[in-house]
C-alpha cells in the first residue's frame, strides 16, 4: 500500500503549526481504514509589509504581502486538492463591515479534474504574493499536477485606502488513504472552520 495521504480542501487558512503521531498513521494504514488526521500538516499565514516584516498595520499606499507556508510534519507525502483556488481564497480582502473588496488575481480557473499540490515528507511549500502587482513577486506555480490548469494572473490593483479590513477563510480538510478498498473511498473530513485576520491601513 502506498504510504501517502490525500487532503481535499475547500479553502485554506490557519495560524496553527502542528504535528502528528506517525505510529497512529501506521496503525491506520495497516488496517486500511479512513483516516482523519487533523495534525498531519501545518499552515503558516501572515501579512507582511514591503520590508518583509510581519504586521497588521500598513501605511496608505504601502503594498501588502500575503505570505503562506504549508508544512508536512509527517514521514509521508501529503497531497492537497485545490478545488476552489487556495491562493485566491487566502488573499480575499473584506472591509470591517463585511463588504467584499477583492483579491489581486485577475482570473483563475481549473479543469473538471482535481488539481493536487504535493508536499514531500517533512517538507514545506512557500508562496508570497503582493496586493499591488510587483514583478519581484512574479507568479511561481509550484503545484505538482498531471492535470491542465489555466495560470492565475496577478492583476494591477490600486492600493487600499485608509480603513479597517480583514481577510477571512473558511476551510475543511478531508483525508483519504490511497488504494483504500473500502466502498465509497473511505474518506472522512472536518467541519467547516473559519478564521479572520484583521488589519488596518492608516
List where the protein language model places each region.
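Short, solvent-exposed loop/edge segments of extracellular or virion-exposed proteins
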Residues: 44-52
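Bacterial Sec-dependent N-terminal signal peptides
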Residues: 15-43
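Short, solvent-exposed loop/linker segments at the N-terminal edge
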Residues: 56-62
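Short, hydrophobic/aromatic beta-strand segments
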Residues: 76-84
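Asparagine-centered strand-capping/turn motif at beta-strand->loop junctions
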Residues: 70-74
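Sec-dependent bacterial lipoprotein signal peptides
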Residues: 1-18
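Extended, well-structured beta-strand/loop surface patches
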Residues: 89-164, 168-202
Amino acid at each position: 500500500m502506498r504510504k501517502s495521504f490525500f487532503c481535499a480542501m475547500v479553502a485554506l487558512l490557519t495560524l496553527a503549526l502542528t504535528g502528528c503521531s506517525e505510529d497512529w498513521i501506521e496503525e491506520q494504514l495497516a488496517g486500511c481504514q479512513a483516516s482523519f488526521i487533523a495534525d498531519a500538516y501545518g499552515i503558516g499565514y501572515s501579512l507582511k509589509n514591503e520590508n518583509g516584516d510581519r504586521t497588521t498595520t500598513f501605511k496608505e499606499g504601502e503594498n501588502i504581502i500575503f505570505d503562506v507556508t504549508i508544512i508536512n510534519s509527517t514521514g509521508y507525502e501529503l497531497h492537497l486538492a485545490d478545488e476552489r483556488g487556495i491562493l485566491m481564497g487566502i488573499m480575499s480582502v473584506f472591509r470591517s463591515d463585511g463588504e467584499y473588496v477583492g483579491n489581486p488575481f485577475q482570473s483563475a480557473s481549473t479543469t473538471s479534474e482535481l488539481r493536487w499540490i504535493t508536499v514531500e515528507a517533512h517538507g514545506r511549500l512557500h508562496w508570497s504574493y503582493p496586493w499591488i502587482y510587483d514583478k519581484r513577486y512574479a507568479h511561481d506555480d509550484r503545484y505538482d499536477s498531471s492535470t491542465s490548469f489555466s495560470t492565475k494572473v496577478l492583476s494591477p490593483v490600486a492600493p487600499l485606502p485608509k480603513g479597517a479590513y480583514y481577510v477571512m477563510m473558511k476551510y475543511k480538510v478531508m483525508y483519504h488513504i490511497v488504494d483504500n478498498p473500502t466502498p465509497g473511498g473511505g474518506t472522512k473530513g472536518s467541519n467547516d472552520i473559519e478564521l479572520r485576520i484583521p488589519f488596518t491601513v492608516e
